[in-house]
Swiss-Prot record:
Designated name of the protein: ATP synthase epsilon chain
Assembly and interaction partners: F-type ATPases have 2 components, CF(1) - the catalytic core - and CF(0) - the membrane proton channel. CF(1) has five subunits: alpha(3), beta(3), gamma(1), delta(1), epsilon(1). CF(0) has three main subunits: a, b and c.
Organism: Francisella tularensis subsp. holarctica (strain LVS)
Protein's membrane topology: Peripheral membrane protein
Pfam families according to UniProt: ATP-synt_DE_N
The keyword DNA repair belongs to this UniProt entry's keyword annotation: no
Superkingdom to which the source organism belongs: Bacteria
Amino acid sequence: MTKKYLKVDVVSPLGSVFKGEADMVSLRGSAGEMGIVYGHTELLSTLPAGVVNVRKGQHTDVLYVSGGIVEVTPTRVTIMVDDMERAENLNQAEAEKARARAKEVLKNPDASKLDIEAANKRLKEADARLKALNSSNGLYYSKDD
Protein backbone atom coordinates (compact mmCIF):
# COMPACT_ATOMS: atom_id res chain seq x y z
CA MET A 1 0.00 0.00 0.00
CA THR A 2 1.29 3.45 -0.91
CA LYS A 3 1.90 5.87 1.94
CA LYS A 4 -0.47 8.84 1.81
CA TYR A 5 0.81 12.24 2.83
CA LEU A 6 -0.89 15.47 3.78
CA LYS A 7 -0.26 18.39 1.48
CA VAL A 8 0.88 21.35 3.59
CA ASP A 9 0.78 24.96 2.47
CA VAL A 10 1.63 28.01 4.58
CA VAL A 11 0.54 31.25 2.95
CA SER A 12 1.12 34.88 3.87
CA PRO A 13 -0.03 38.09 2.23
CA LEU A 14 3.05 37.68 -0.01
CA GLY A 15 1.92 34.26 -1.26
CA SER A 16 3.01 30.73 -0.44
CA VAL A 17 5.92 30.73 2.03
CA PHE A 18 6.11 26.96 2.65
CA LYS A 19 4.90 23.95 0.67
CA GLY A 20 5.50 20.34 1.53
CA GLU A 21 4.12 16.93 2.39
CA ALA A 22 3.77 15.47 5.86
CA ASP A 23 3.04 12.34 7.82
CA MET A 24 1.89 14.64 10.61
CA VAL A 25 1.48 18.34 11.33
CA SER A 26 1.45 19.43 14.97
CA LEU A 27 0.44 22.89 16.12
CA ARG A 28 -1.53 24.77 18.76
CA GLY A 29 -4.98 25.88 17.71
CA SER A 30 -7.61 27.79 19.63
CA ALA A 31 -8.74 24.58 21.36
CA GLY A 32 -5.21 23.41 22.25
CA GLU A 33 -2.57 21.13 20.75
CA MET A 34 -3.46 19.32 17.53
CA GLY A 35 -1.81 16.45 15.72
CA ILE A 36 -3.09 16.25 12.16
CA VAL A 37 -2.58 13.18 9.96
CA TYR A 38 -3.90 12.08 6.56
CA GLY A 39 -7.66 11.50 6.79
CA HIS A 40 -8.22 14.01 9.62
CA THR A 41 -11.70 15.43 9.90
CA GLU A 42 -12.27 18.89 8.45
CA LEU A 43 -11.78 21.83 10.77
CA LEU A 44 -11.06 25.52 10.85
CA SER A 45 -9.23 27.09 13.80
CA THR A 46 -7.43 30.24 14.78
CA LEU A 47 -3.75 29.99 15.71
CA PRO A 48 -1.87 32.05 18.26
CA ALA A 49 1.77 32.92 17.58
CA GLY A 50 3.56 29.60 17.93
CA VAL A 51 5.34 26.59 16.53
CA VAL A 52 4.21 24.37 13.66
CA ASN A 53 6.01 21.05 13.20
CA VAL A 54 5.73 19.46 9.75
CA ARG A 55 7.03 15.88 9.95
CA LYS A 56 7.74 13.57 7.03
CA GLY A 57 9.58 10.40 7.92
CA GLN A 58 12.58 11.24 10.09
CA HIS A 59 12.67 14.90 9.01
CA THR A 60 10.75 17.69 10.74
CA ASP A 61 10.44 21.25 9.48
CA VAL A 62 10.02 23.53 12.48
CA LEU A 63 8.23 26.78 11.66
CA TYR A 64 7.49 29.89 13.68
CA VAL A 65 4.13 31.42 12.74
CA SER A 66 2.90 34.81 13.89
CA GLY A 67 -0.61 33.52 14.36
CA GLY A 68 -3.40 33.13 11.87
CA ILE A 69 -5.89 30.53 10.71
CA VAL A 70 -5.53 26.83 9.92
CA GLU A 71 -7.87 24.97 7.57
CA VAL A 72 -7.74 21.18 7.64
CA THR A 73 -9.28 18.78 5.13
CA PRO A 74 -8.65 15.02 5.04
CA THR A 75 -5.79 15.51 2.54
CA ARG A 76 -4.53 19.06 3.11
CA VAL A 77 -3.46 21.53 5.80
CA THR A 78 -3.49 25.21 4.82
CA ILE A 79 -2.14 27.73 7.31
CA MET A 80 -2.77 31.42 6.66
CA VAL A 81 -0.41 33.72 8.57
CA ASP A 82 0.92 37.27 8.57
CA ASP A 83 4.49 36.01 9.04
CA MET A 84 6.36 32.68 9.04
CA GLU A 85 10.01 31.83 9.58
CA ARG A 86 11.85 28.53 9.60
CA ALA A 87 13.35 27.89 13.03
CA GLU A 88 16.86 27.59 11.58
CA ASN A 89 16.58 31.18 10.31
CA LEU A 90 15.55 32.65 13.66
CA ASN A 91 18.02 34.63 15.76
CA GLN A 92 17.94 33.76 19.46
CA ALA A 93 19.62 36.99 20.58
CA GLU A 94 17.08 39.10 18.65
CA ALA A 95 14.16 37.11 20.11
CA GLU A 96 15.53 37.52 23.64
CA LYS A 97 16.01 41.29 23.11
CA ALA A 98 12.45 41.63 21.79
CA ARG A 99 11.19 39.71 24.82
CA ALA A 100 13.13 41.97 27.21
CA ARG A 101 11.89 45.16 25.47
CA ALA A 102 8.28 43.98 25.71
CA LYS A 103 8.69 43.16 29.41
CA GLU A 104 10.12 46.64 30.04
CA VAL A 105 7.03 48.25 28.53
CA LEU A 106 4.80 46.01 30.65
CA LYS A 107 6.65 47.09 33.83
CA ASN A 108 6.10 50.77 33.05
CA PRO A 109 3.18 52.05 35.17
CA ASP A 110 2.73 54.98 32.77
CA ALA A 111 2.36 52.81 29.65
CA SER A 112 -0.83 53.42 27.69
CA LYS A 113 -3.37 50.69 27.09
CA LEU A 114 -2.32 50.63 23.43
CA ASP A 115 1.37 50.25 24.39
CA ILE A 116 0.49 47.42 26.78
CA GLU A 117 -1.52 45.57 24.12
CA ALA A 118 1.32 45.94 21.60
CA ALA A 119 3.90 44.80 24.19
CA ASN A 120 1.80 41.74 25.07
CA LYS A 121 1.61 40.83 21.37
CA ARG A 122 5.39 41.29 20.92
CA LEU A 123 6.05 39.23 24.06
CA LYS A 124 3.93 36.33 22.76
CA GLU A 125 5.69 36.50 19.39
CA ALA A 126 9.15 36.55 21.01
CA ASP A 127 8.21 33.59 23.23
CA ALA A 128 6.94 31.70 20.17
CA ARG A 129 10.21 32.37 18.32
CA LEU A 130 12.18 31.05 21.31
CA LYS A 131 9.97 27.95 21.44
CA ALA A 132 10.59 27.35 17.73
CA LEU A 133 14.34 27.67 18.30
CA ASN A 134 14.19 25.25 21.23
CA SER A 135 12.03 22.85 19.23
CA SER A 136 14.51 22.83 16.35
CA ASN A 137 17.22 21.94 18.87
CA GLY A 138 15.22 18.93 20.07
CA LEU A 139 13.86 20.72 23.13
CA TYR A 140 10.23 21.00 22.07
CA TYR A 141 7.84 21.97 24.78
CA SER A 142 4.41 23.43 24.73
CA LYS A 143 3.30 25.63 27.56
CA ASP A 144 0.67 28.28 27.93
CA ASP A 145 2.23 31.36 29.48
